[in-house]
Amino acid sequence: VQTCALPICQEIMSLLAEEAKLMEIVKLIGSDVLPEDQKLVIEICKVIRVGYLQQNAFHKDDTYVPLQKQMKMMDVILYLYKKCKDLVAQGKPMSQVVASGIFDKVTKMKYDVPNDHIELLDDYFRQIDAAVSQVA
């Protein structure tokens, strides 16, 4: 088993491991009974799996993704997680955050940002801030 020494990779792997445990509970009793912070883990892991880990070999920008873009995408995903974690700590329901559409936008970023314009990923931080401020 290969492990990543980078803290950002470790945080993502930790979230995915936590999601695996939570999915056992979800299979038995459903996700409605989970506390909001655990619902957040499940939602952010969907973004990680679909928007980051899953690869489309037939898409021109997803066939090969430069390391800089991969790292920036991880930054964006973890920024979304931290901002949403703050909202949940304030008592905001995950349903409001998901309804804002920001999870879908972040999931699609690998297709929306060309590999030769990685700087466009910086705009996702602003979009996350805007979505969070609307929910807050």
Question: What residues fall within each predicted segment?
Answer:
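Conserved catalytic/coupling modules of large nucleotide/cofactor-utilizing molecular machines
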Residues: 1-136
